[in-house]
């Protein structure tokens, strides 16, 4: 039995904390006393198999002894030193990234550390504009790159742009006054299941004589229409995290060809997909999203770089950009970037991932899980599409498989206003939780799932059983 007074904790939590996704009147939370492996453990001892991996970031699993021991050693050695000082941990992590993990990439040269994912994106945008002397950055429909001032300009998920919604469906969403889209523009998403350009994949590959996917062709036209001489970079997720979209495998190679043709930079946002999530070290290397090796100019990292034992972000830059940064005095620093204890977490996490070949384990687990999902799709009429690999999965939930009709018409353009209790993802997640499994999603009709990259077959079977139960519940409720 817990020694913590959780009744008192609940009182303080409700009284003093600002909560996400609910008004004060809607207050309700799940208390977690500890974590273990792939489980969250509640005060009463209930074990919840975490198959959204705390926002897909605990790649090595919870409480890994080697990582925890390394952090404790760093705490014994360090209080704090700031960015201008070098610790052994910082140098070792950079060596692990560039020499060991990215040694065959053909592009990666140096690393700049940041506070987390959004800060890494901010740093990459700053570098892109400084290096090129150009102001504009191209983003994409449904992209998510963070919610800080620069990153949010490229986040094209409506709830993440508007920041606040109301319990009443009739009330307007609360938006930040003024423009939050300065020096950015949006390009089409490679969302084949619901193509905004009206095409069908794979037939769309034959739509043009040059073989360009229509979404890539339209992206290039938009960049040209904004004047290539003013465009610094395009930023893409290798697969969409919050937006939950798996692009076709031709997309990333064609984006690389396009950026080379136009002479712009390509930033790959690997904050969520990095470190084994898609069954490769980085998402842009995964064979589920690319037909060949591709070379970005910069790559943003966070989450899996420490398996979220402690917060850390990073930007990996190419040799050309590294040479440029070596030629200037880089004055953009912050207090906590490269914190020695966070760097220790990264060092011991990366060593663990390398030693245990975690990307390969993720890929193997994904093959097993896909087979289980396909079995479920044959039983449940509401499973319209399955996408994913490794330990990141997208399931489109539909009224009708043939017409692809969504239960919530707004889909990825939802504002999060009104009664959300009948959203398919909430019905699914609530029912799965009854079976001790946590799954979720950010958009109403799309289930987003994935555990630690070393999730076992027994744990995957537990997830599949819970999903079978949950989809049965959904179909009884909504059909």
Where do the language-model regions lie?
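Conserved N-terminal phosphate-binding loop of PLP-dependent enzymes in the Aspartate aminotransferase
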Residues: 1-479
């Amino acid at each position: 039995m817990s020694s913590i007074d959780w009744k008192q904790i609940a009182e303080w939590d409700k009284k003093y904390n600002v909560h996400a996704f609910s008004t004060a009147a809607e207050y309700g939370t799940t208390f977690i006393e500890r974590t273990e492996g792939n489980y969250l453990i509640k005060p009463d001892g209930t074990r919840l198999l975490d198959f959204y991996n705390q926002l897909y970031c605990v790649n090595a699993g919870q409480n890994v002894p080697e990582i925890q021991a390394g952090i404790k050693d760093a705490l014994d050695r360090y209080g704090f030193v700031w960015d201008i000082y070098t610790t052994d941990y910082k140098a070792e992590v950079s060596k692990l990234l560039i020499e060991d993990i990215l040694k065959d990439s053909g592009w990666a040269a140096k690393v700049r550390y940041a506070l987390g994912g959004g800060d890494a994106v901010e740093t990459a945008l700053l570098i892109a504009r400084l290096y090129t002397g150009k102001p504009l950055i191209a983003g994409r429909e449904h992209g998510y790159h963070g919610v800080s001032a620069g990153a949010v300009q490229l986040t094209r998920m409506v709830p993440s742009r508007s920041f606040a919604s109301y319990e009443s469906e009739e009330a307007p969403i609360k938006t930040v006054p003024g423009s939050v889209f300065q020096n950015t523009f949006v390009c089409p998403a490679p969302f084949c299941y619901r193509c905004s350009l009206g095409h069908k994949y794979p037939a769309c590959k034959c739509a043009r004589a040059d073989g360009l996917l229509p979404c890539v062709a339209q992206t290039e036209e938009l960049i040209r229409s904004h004047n290539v001489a003013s465009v610094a970079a395009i930023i893409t997720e290798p697969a969409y995290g919050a937006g939950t979209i798996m692009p076709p495998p031709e997309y990333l190679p064609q984006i690389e060809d396009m950026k080379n043709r136009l002479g712009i930079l390509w930033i790959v946002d690997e904050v969520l997909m990095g470190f084994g999530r898609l069954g490769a070290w980085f998402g842009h290397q995964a064979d589920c999203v690319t037909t060949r090796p591709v070379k970005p100019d910069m790559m943003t990292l966070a989450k899996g770089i420490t398996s979220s034992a402690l917060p850390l972000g990073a930007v990996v830059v190419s040799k050309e950009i590294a040479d440029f940064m070596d030629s200037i005095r880089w004055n953009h620093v912050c207090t906590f970037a490269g914190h020695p204890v966070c760097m220790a977490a990264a060092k011991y996490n990366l060593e663990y991932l390398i030693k245990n070949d975690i990307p390969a384990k993720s890929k193997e687990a994904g093959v097993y899980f896909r087979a289980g999902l396909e079995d479920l799709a044959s039983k449940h009429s509401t499973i319209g599409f399955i996408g994913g690999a490794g330990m990141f999965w997208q399931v489109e939930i539909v009224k009708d498989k043939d017409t692809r009709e969504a239960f919530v018409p707004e889909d990825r353009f939802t504002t999060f206003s009104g009664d959300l209790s009948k959203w398919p993802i909430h019905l699914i997640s609530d029912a799965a939780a009854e079976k001790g499994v946590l799954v979720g999603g950010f958009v109403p009709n799309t289930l987003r799932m994935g555990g630690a990259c070393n999730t076992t077959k027994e744990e995957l079977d537990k997830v599949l059983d819970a999903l079978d139960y949950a989809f049965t519940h959904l179909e009884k409720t909504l059909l």
